[in-house]
Amino acid sequence: MEKYIKEHTLKPNEIERYGRQLITPDIGVSGQMSLCNSSVLIIGAGGLGCPVALYLSSAGIGTLGLVDYDTVEISNLHRQIGHRESSKGISKAVSLSKTISELNSLIKVNTYETTFTSETAMEIIKNYDIVVDASDNVATRYLVNDACVLTGKPLVSGSALKWEGQITCYNYNNGPCYRCIFPTPPPVETVTKCSDGGVLGPIVGVIGSLQALEVIKILTNNKEGVLSGRLLIYDGMSAVFRTVRIRGKQSGCNVCGDKPTVTQLIDYTQFCQSNYSESAGK
Amino acid sequence: MEKYIKEHTLKPNEIERYGRQLITPDIGVSGQMSLCNSSVLIIGAGGLGCPVALYLSSAGIGTLGLVDYDTVEISNLHRQIGHRESSKGISKAVSLSKTISELNSLIKVNTYETTFTSETAMEIIKNYDIVVDASDNVATRYLVNDACVLTGKPLVSGSALKWEGQITCYNYNNGPCYRCIFPTPPPVETVTKCSDGGVLGPIVGVIGSLQALEVIKILTNNKEGVLSGRLLIYDGMSAVFRTVRIRGKQSGCNVCGDKPTVTQLIDYTQFCQSNYSESAGK
Amino acid sequence: MKVKIELSGGLELLFDKKKVHEIEFSDKNEIPLKDLILYMRDNLLKERSELFVVDDTVRPGILVLINDADWELFGGISYNVEDKDTIIFISTLHGG
Amino acid sequence: MKVKIELSGGLELLFDKKKVHEIEFSDKNEIPLKDLILYMRDNLLKERSELFVVDDTVRPGILVLINDADWELFGGISYNVEDKDTIIFISTLHGG
Ligand SMILES: [Zn+2]
Ligand SMILES: [Zn+2]
């Protein structure tokens, strides 16, 4: 249902820019106002982070935070469409911030040229309404999950490798968190990195776009449609998607359960036996 | 299966740039060489055309053609992530060409600041291996289909509106064409335009990324996976995709059948009772 | 017999904005697809029926799926709908 | 009984790169999921079994689906696989 409200705070240049978005059913003027008044933190400005940031900035999310310690390399550009050749060697967070500012100067962008760690996470995350996990390694995924649970933020989590991708939302509307589904980190030798296995640009394009849409659904309060308690699995080679039902919030979960054992951030590199950075592991 | 070949024509800067793509299974060095030696024509530099062009240029398609008569408006920017505010008023084909050249200077881009019509289509299309339909109206869709059938080019067709999208490949590997599935144009009053119904950026992001991947599969000869004879239907609100089986090539089809009645391009604005441009219909 | 009907591509707007309809015909074991379409027109769709049915079949631009496959693979309008079939009506999109 | 097994997220690489395996147990009507997993380890997977099975269950990081739903909703490893069930093993991805 389209929601029209008489008193709104959108400026004429916002009406002009977002017109075809706010006439979309279930967005409406009130939905657009929610987007403009919200803040989203994106962990990772790489293959997934680029489409997420491009679509969220163009949609008019009021404040975007971009966290990435890496710098742009030419070998990133086959899939990281938010960077430019001229950004080679500079921070990915800054490079992506520059691109999205040229696309939409109405929004605010904060860049964090730092590794997201147990030391930096809480100070950064507290300023945002929603977190997007667009990272590339196991340790960061557990860290982001726990930080979201401890601060009560919904987490839109996407991942990709080769021809495949996966996406779901954690810690949303009393749904499960990452640890509810994966209480124990995978053995190190079973984890394939994009730098080893390869990954195609359109795969991260699909998953990143899907992550941006989940953020929009959460912020416009389209609760029923949110991918919570459901996991979307994508096989690009066969062009088949599968939406499967996963377990709900687990009362025995170590971080979001009834008697959590994790009540503050831990050392995730130790927990996962791996680094916070894909490249650091090489 | 990864294909390694000893004699290849990739230059060192191509190996550097496409390394993580060419190590992906079923791409390989030979697949990358195919991409670098291919040409793709994209009809429409709007919501779908932007992600298609960004991902195909970054993947290293040798030559991209961009056809669009429109100019960039601020109201496009909520979903057309390949343009910039500073491109306001200039040709969409030129604006998008500028963005992708900054992303990958190794590829060649041709811009056609013209409406794709029965008069211009054949001269443009003959220079390309594959065509992507990223247009926004019925008349252009029939025109592009017939031009592809008459010139024997595979067609990767995507469309989107509001929270939904659809994608399939036509005229590929003896599969059906658009007219096989839709022999008669829809009544004008049943066609909703994006300018009336709205559309969300991530929806065109998903469909455009999927179109780029189909192009890559066709060019790298991953025949089995190509969405031919199958239609992918996407409902973004419920986060559900459905891949359905559609009819094969129809012997009675007016353009690709055994006794075609359409042997050269016709007047599609008359056939469809509508214009080649969404905005012209306003 | 029970039939599940799904609508997409905007067609649901003609049917009370509901994307899924479950219909039960307690007196039948099967029903010609043509009769089901006319039933939908006369009972589920209240106005502007020409946006759904033209000449006693679905209008051009609507793709009909029988259990996730194109109805042309099953004889099109002459198919007999059986118990527990899912019939999907998709309006093709043209935007971009 | 017949069981359909699907592998994704790279797990298919351990199983001859085949994403779909159909297994028939002509002498059984049902089989404990644990036995099926050990059967897969011993018969379909030839080397590096520790990448699939640890402590007689799937290793951490693999999600098991029974007919498109999380196995935890059906009792996990203690589920009894029935005729025509589809069991999916998904290795979770971490890249981006
Ligand atoms: Zn939990
Ligand atoms: Zn045809």
UniProtKB/Swiss-Prot annotation, chains C, D:
Keywords: Cytoplasm, Isopeptide bond, tRNA processing, Ubl conjugation pathway. It is found in: Cytoplasm. GO terms for molecular function: protein tag activity. Disulfide bonds: none annotated. There is a cross-link at residue 96 (Glycyl lysine isopeptide (Gly-Lys) (interchain with K-? in acceptor proteins)). InterPro entries: Beta-grasp_dom_sf (IPR012675), Mopterin_synth/thiamin_S_b (IPR016155), Urm1 (IPR015221). GO terms for biological process: protein urmylation; tRNA thio-modification; tRNA wobble uridine modification. The keyword Nuclease does not apply. The modification 1-thioglycine is found at residue 96. Gene3D superfamilies: 3.10.20.30. Pfam families: Urm1. GO terms for cellular component: cytosol; nucleus. Pathway: tRNA modification; 5-methoxycarbonylmethyl-2-thiouridine-tRNA biosynthesis. C-terminal thiocarboxylation occurs in 2 steps, it is first acyl-adenylated (-COAMP) via the hesA/moeB/thiF part of the MOCS3 homolog, then thiocarboxylated (-COSH) via the rhodanese domain of the MOCS3 homolog. Belongs to the URM1 family. Acts as a sulfur carrier required for 2-thiolation of mcm(5)S(2)U at tRNA wobble positions of cytosolic tRNA(Lys), tRNA(Glu) and tRNA(Gln). Serves as sulfur donor in tRNA 2-thiolation reaction by being thiocarboxylated (-COSH) at its C-terminus by the MOCS3 homolog. The sulfur is then transferred to tRNA to form 2-thiolation of mcm(5)S(2)U. Also acts as a ubiquitin-like protein (UBL) that is covalently conjugated via an isopeptide bond to lysine residues of target proteins. HAMAP family: Urm1. PANTHER family: RURM1 PROTEIN (PTHR14986). This is Ubiquitin-related modifier 1 homolog.
